[in-house]
Amino acid sequence: MHKSSLSPCIHSIMGIEIGDTTKAVQYFLRSALVDLHDNQGNTECGMHAASAGGTWMSVVFGFGGFRVKNNKMTFKPWLPEEWKELQFKLKWRGDDLKVTIRPNEGVFALLSDNQKTEEIVVFDKSYQLESGKETTIPF
């Protein structure tokens, strides 16, 4: 089924989207370990760089639950039970956003030298981020 190294990352994202989290983790690991485990049988030809990008997509769009809807950043994160934390940065409208996801909360920090605010949506509820401040959102 997964003849391409680009397939497992998308299946991981969709697994989280439809609630099949066991498969989501399996596909994420297959994507992340494609070269270490030589899943495609051709690692000696070079690393699967696009699969590395797909693994990043699994982290951000899958486990981080990041989407853009109505010109706003939205998040519906999910972490596997054995994960304590997930952290990543996004570039949004010229500024960095640091995202930390823990089992019961998300911490969002708009890293900007400018005085600005940015609306985000987490599990369908709106929050205002202020530059230079961390916003902790329980879930």
PLM feature segments, named:
Residues 5, 13-139:
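Non-catalytic C-terminal accessory modules of carbohydrate-active enzymes
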